[in-house]
Amino acid sequence: MLKFLYYYLRSMRLYYGFVTATTVLAGLCLAHGTYNELKLSWTLTDLPWTLRDAALLAMGFFAWGFNQIFSDWCDRKEDAINAPHRPMVTGALKPLPAFAVSAVGLAAIAVAGYLMSPWTLAFLALGGALNIAYSLLKRVPVLNCLVYAYAISCCALFAIAGIAGRCPNGPELEFVGDWIVPAHFLMCHNSYFKDVEGDRAAGVRTLQTIWPRVAKFVSVCCPCLAVLRLNFLSWFNVELFVLSVIVVALVIVFQRLVSHSMFHRATCLNCQLCVLMLLFHFIAATWLYAIVSLVAIQLLFLWYNDEKE
């Protein structure tokens, strides 16, 4: 039992849990405040923060891991080359018991979400459908990242519905489309750099396998131009400027790690970059969470120290 739990937790890739949890937090910030896109300002409303927010954050954190079990099974052909030491590939983690645990976990999230608001089921179903579509479209460059981005962004919509008891409104949907979706697109795009060898062998087409220079251009220019635009619109607000410098530095370091085939450290940095991008507009209120998340991701990567896993 302990052996199964150990390999199940490793297969959950807990560091990615902070990506979905942070997406939930971004959704909660939208529900708890009013975001002015012209002034790039976020103002808290009277909606109180409660244990329900904490419950939604926990759901977001574990949702990635529960789903990752199914993804590992579907991707075992590519993983046999890219990550041959993963428990699902080596046989250390038995599929059926792992599927059962994940199914129960996802069902618990669905029930808890429904009790908060029936709207949550719609976004849970949409995210699940898009995740299946992503698995089927992995061989289609750009579209694969776009579908993935919309799938994970459903976490923010799930959070808004769960805490506010309503469907997300127009400005909230616009923010998700303008910022949260691109942040996840970038993370998915960056994740393919480490998989070039296995993807080529398995016939998976990504920008990294067919147009590597374009892939690098997207990885560097998109986040840098995004934060530059926000700084220009905010007349170089000090907080945003400092955070922008950090983001640009992480982008540069990420590319250096990739160029030296240091993919394990690059994956860690990719996670941290995504967390910062998601919280970019709300950093004044979420800076403590951001620091804890970045440190936790770094520490978790010490446990996941096998680059082939």
Identify the function of each model-found stretch.
Residues 1-309:
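Multi-pass alpha-helical membrane architecture of UbiA-family
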